[in-house]
């Protein structure tokens, strides 16, 4: 990969490898969201997809994530504008908005350690739907806050 390719290319110009490497692996996109029926506001919860490993923040079966029966959505160059619910720290969202990557991003630091240390991942912060009785009790923040 070209060094700092994300500063030199637009999202649509990136190779598949570059595109995939933008994901910091925080796991935030693997959390269930709730939508207010009246306002269409999206609320984040700490309820994880059953395929998310809460320690590694990675999908337990990444290659099969779109056929697993879970509601995993494929983020692509063509549909990035539809994903306005992505966290404010998401590299795809940041670059689409012409903003820089955060200083803890693995592409900058070389590892995920800084992301975890900054508290920007869902590591050990989630519950699974099977354990949830009232989803509204699991709302973690206001829409679009990181």
UniProtKB/Swiss-Prot annotation:
- On the tree of life, the source organism's domain of life is Bacteria
InterPro entries per the record?
Puta_zinc/iron-chelating_dom, UCP006173
The record's listing under Pfam families reads: CxxCxxCC
Disulfide-bond pairs as recorded: none
Looking up PANTHER family in the UniProt record yields: UPF0260 PROTEIN YCGN (PTHR37421:SF1)
Matching entries from HAMAP family are given as: UPF0260
Task: Spell out the family assignment given in the record's similarity comment.
Answer: Belongs to the UPF0260 family.
The identity of this protein, by name, is: UPF0260 protein VF_1660
State the organism named in the record. Answer: Aliivibrio fischeri (strain ATCC 700601 / ES114)
């Amino acid at each position: 990969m070209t060094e700092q390719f994300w500063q030199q290319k637009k999202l649509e110009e990136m190779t598949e490898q570059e595109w995939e490497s933008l994901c910091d692996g925080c796991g935030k996109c693997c959390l269930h969201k709730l939508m207010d029926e009246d306002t269409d506001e999206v609320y984040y919860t700490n309820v994880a997809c059953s395929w998310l490993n809460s320690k590694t923040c990675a999908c337990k079966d990444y290659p099969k994530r779109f056929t697993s029966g879970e509601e995993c959505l494929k983020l692509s160059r063509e549909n990035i504008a539809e994903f306005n619910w992505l966290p404010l720290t998401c590299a795809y969202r940041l670059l689409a908005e012409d903003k820089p990557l955060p200083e803890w991003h693995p592409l900058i630091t070389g590892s995920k350690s800084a992301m975890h240390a900054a508290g920007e991942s869902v590591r050990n912060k989630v519950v699974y739907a099977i354990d949830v009785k009232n989803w509204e009790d699991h709302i973690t923040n206001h829409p679009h806050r990181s």
